Amino acid sequence: MLVNAPKYSDLAYWDNIVNQYIQGKHPYILIPNIERQIWDYFKYCLKSQNRYFFQHPLIPVIKASFEKNLYILKKDTELFRARNDNQHTIWKENWRYAEIMSEPKYLERLRNSGYDSTKLDEMCANHSSVLNDPETIRIKDKLDRGFQGYDADGCSAPPSELASAGRCNSEGVAYLYAAQEEHTAVAEIRPYVGDTISIATLHPKRDLRLVNLDYDPSATISGAEFFYHEIQEEFARVNKGQKSDYLITQYITSLVEHSGYSGLCFRSSLVEDGTNYVIFRPNDCEAVSSKICYLKGVQYQYFQFKS
């Protein structure tokens, strides 16, 4: 019987159990907590085997649930992406540009005050040179297009060589992470009080077919729905920096991508009712603007354990 079987010691035995369960055959469907045991077995296999050659009888059940949870992200829907300006690079260049633009008024006041004309001419020539500097022109162009924070390229996903492992992507895979709400996008980068943050607004260039993994802890589930609910919970779980905790979500994400979808959405683990988006091809979205913000404070929620 299943309850007396050595825990995952015989993979063929467990695969048979899963197949029998999927086919609805007695006695496996009658065993208490059978879905939980099958799901734990699935996670055990995924963590202990080479996931690039991973085969498991539960995979077709998982893939079949994707189309049932299809979500169409409409073209031009507002999404938000935040980046931390740790070195104050963007803030400093914006401030320097503001200083450059204010210098003509200062020079004019010097001229009216009888300031040495030779020195004044040198200052005016220097200002003209700075105005025509390629870096100044770049910043002006960026600001004119509505990008106070990072420019359009900087608002998208990082280059593959800089992409570190995340909830949905393995190292070197560049997905675009965004959020439905501005404050969710900020919370997801976990900034410190006093940080300056670039917040971008992005729009999908076309309607995108996503898999909805939004987690509802109060949902009533039964049968095969249990496995999809567990997947949703994996995406909504708080991660404390352990990369191994991302193996499940990274694998499910790869299943979604290779099933032909453009991305997925799931509940934020940091913001109640916040929604995150992952777009597999960053070029499917375009940044339309960005702004620089200062993190003033963070509000914590907590509850007391009762004995």
Please place each PLM-identified region on the residue numbering.
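Active-site and NAD+-binding cores of ADP-ribose-processing enzymes
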Residues: 1-172, 191-307
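Short active-site loop/helix that positions an aromatic residue
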Residues: 182-193
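Conserved structured core elements
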Residues: 179-183, 246
